[in-house]
């Protein structure tokens, strides 16, 4: 998967990009760890209220759903291996998974702006 640098307000991160059906379906499944300030960015062709789950994912994660303007719509904490879904509250073009608590530690949430997002 391609790797890019993103800016979430003042925080620099490195993100693997999942931009096709295969990479989006696999996501962070089976990963045992994430390096500090690393995550996975899911890129979609169309904006929609996408939902995610944690099947086969041993890491606790927080997901940020992001609109086409690069603004965080909402966050959701996701527990390892949980099969319940976490959905965007409004149409999203992107979703960013980071280690659980990363956004809270950096005081980021709904309305926070991302820079460096790729075009779908």
Q: What label would you give each PLM region?
A:
Residues 1-120:
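Compact, glycine-rich, soluble single-domain proteins
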